[in-house]
């Protein structure tokens, strides 16, 4: 591999082959040279050369029809790609698995009048199941970029051949040189991240469960993998299933001896025995926790920065992600097995194959968990009262079955760090799809309207509150008795965690954007009760009274963002399990 283009194309095509691609139809051109060479030189791929792109695409369609597996067609940039369209329409309508790989000009030539350059991004519209416009190859790509090429290829094959089968379009821009000419400074040998996990095997296995569930052979393979490794983790991110899932995760943790690290808005942080919630603190900064060998994931990408960093640095040999609907959530591109299946059904099928195991590994996490909450509780009465303590107290005061919505930015992170797991079942919600601060109050009120028989609370920051203040009109119009905890640190407090905080005056003027607002008048305008608090005793009293009375109340806690910022890492350092044993 002599330059970045050859490296990218070779890595992508190699993973397509590992995922099952056997037939590729090639049409001549210049811009697709790296792809042509990668396909022609791969020993597992049979290539068919065609003079015309339209014929090549239909020939690939025939291959896919005959084999019932995805076939690929490759072309250069410009109108060559448009000639794929008739075959793509047919493949879409007939449900035939097909990969369209179109080479493209670099981004700076798009919309510039450059020769043989058209808009190829999503050019096949709704006739494809998935369309990706790849980034330009880099001279020395970081490992995550190389891993992303392999997971992209695995996903492309899985989606094209999934249920229903159809077309996947990958658009690949290249700058010259397109031929295998050596370029000084370009990557010449694959880094470790580019290597497959074992000879001939895919980097990521993608499996979609059938109506009868996950095949027994796959369940047995996963069970065998878990039994081989004592050091494992169960990680539950946001938006895990409801129903029996939480109890099944607890049972899976007991059976495997793996700690279950559950996100504050996973749906199972509160009310399920044995789950771990203090990881944002005990994994903070430098720590002595050994890396896990295997990770079983459910839900979306975790909220916790330090948990994500720990998992990425650990580079487990196996990361098994189970998620109904097949929605991908792996921004570090570490997943080795992606199983699109009902999570509860998967665990139920897996449990009979596992022998109960409990060792020093899980005890280490349980000891760290106990130490974290002991340190947090010891610091709660320290002055001044801070936002994380208010979140801890709100969770501790909510009754069984209550609903809690947390706003984005800091509150959702505070819940993840300071929401102590407990016996009471609390239903926690957040807008973690795009993680915006817009519409959070309205979403919280919608949650309350959907659960009219249980107490409802929301915790939001001041900028989030300001963004959706008009949503408060629904409190009276729709009859939603909600307790809103307003954490007012006079601006975008989360920006204090970013390196830009060292650069004044721009940091204060354009990132924090202090507003100097108090929100008593907003409460009065929309007909809500209002309480401003400054200490722990006042907050706990106001929150308890509002929840018990099912009153529509705004409880405003004014804090200092810089003081809160200093308080959190100091608490984390004091709570860290510094004496964790090496295993």
From Swiss-Prot:
Alphabetic keyword roster: Magnesium, Manganese, Menaquinone biosynthesis, Metal-binding, Thiamine pyrophosphate, Transferase
Entry-linked Gene3D superfamilies: 3.40.50.970, TPP-binding domain
Keyword Metal-binding: yes
Cofactor(s) annotated in UniProt: Mg(2+); Mn(2+); thiamine diphosphate
InterPro entries (UniProt xref): DHS-like_NAD/FAD-binding_dom, MenaQ_synth_MenD, MenD_middle, THDP-binding, Thiamin_PyroP_enz_TPP-bd_dom, TPP_enzyme_TPP-bd
Gene Ontology process terms (BP): menaquinone biosynthetic process
Cofactor, free-text remark: Binds 1 thiamine pyrophosphate per subunit.
EC class: transferase
Pathway note: Quinol/quinone metabolism; 1,4-dihydroxy-2-naphthoate biosynthesis; 1,4-dihydroxy-2-naphthoate from chorismate: step 2/7; Quinol/quinone metabolism; menaquinone biosynthesis
Molecular function as annotated in GO: 2-succinyl-5-enolpyruvyl-6-hydroxy-3-cyclohexene-1-carboxylic-acid synthase activity; magnesium ion binding; manganese ion binding; thiamine pyrophosphate binding
Pfam families: TPP_enzyme_C (PF02775), TPP_enzyme_M_2 (PF16582), TPP_enzyme_N (PF02776)
CDD domains: TPP_PYR_MenD, TPP_SHCHC_synthase
Catalytic activity: isochorismate + 2-oxoglutarate + H(+) = 5-enolpyruvoyl-6-hydroxy-2-succinyl-cyclohex-3-ene-1-carboxylate + CO2
Keyword Nucleotidyltransferase in record: no
Enzyme Commission identifier(s): 2.2.1.9
HAMAP family: MenD
Role according to the record: Catalyzes the thiamine diphosphate-dependent decarboxylation of 2-oxoglutarate and the subsequent addition of the resulting succinic semialdehyde-thiamine pyrophosphate anion to isochorismate to yield 2-succinyl-5-enolpyruvyl-6-hydroxy-3-cyclohexene-1-carboxylate (SEPHCHC).
NCBIfam families, per the entry: menD
Family membership noted in the UniProt record: Belongs to the TPP enzyme family. MenD subfamily.
Self-association and partners: Homodimer.
Name under which the protein is recorded: 2-succinyl-5-enolpyruvyl-6-hydroxy-3-cyclohexene-1-carboxylate synthase
Organism name: Roseiflexus sp. (strain RS-1)
